[in-house]
Amino acid sequence: ATQHPQVDYNGLLYSSVPYASAPSQAVNFVASHDGYTVIDKLRLSVKGDHADDELPPIDKLIHTILLTAQGVPFIRAGEEMMQDKQGEPNSFRSPDAVNRIDWALKAKNRDLFDYVRGLIALRKAHPAFRIPTAEGLQQGLHFLDTGDSGVIAYTLGEYANGDAWKEILVAY
């Protein structure tokens, strides 16, 4: 979203330049009230005999990326407990049974709920995950060469944004 010397903006489909001048101008989200929930999207894309078993770890990865990325994270209410909208892509005219938060899911999916709560606490405790300026991001965030592994990894270093930790390694 902001200028970084290690990012090649020529490969982007929507723009050849960054669209934000500061990380705080980028709102990061996977789902909102306007479409499918995260779990609905996953159910549409993850197929096979063990798909239901694969959804929670994928959901954890999604939340890990969202809450460790620079910018402002946005989490739709209920995502932290695998709330769905019964596959409804636009629930504007749907009944409360589709749109309400099913609080029983908090107990059923407690592992994910606690995991997301822990990620929020990590983000709040470490200002390196909330670098406010493009200059701070350019100085503190360094991508690692992971080749063709499919892994994205970077460090937040030198006490980025006044963090108590000298260096943080983030890898997905």
What function would you assign to each model-found segment?
Residues 96:
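Conserved, charged catalytic cores of large soluble enzymes
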Residues 99-102:
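Catalytic cores of eukaryotic secretory-pathway lumenal/extracellular enzymes that build
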Residues 106-137:
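Catalytic cores of secreted or luminal carbohydrate-active enzymes
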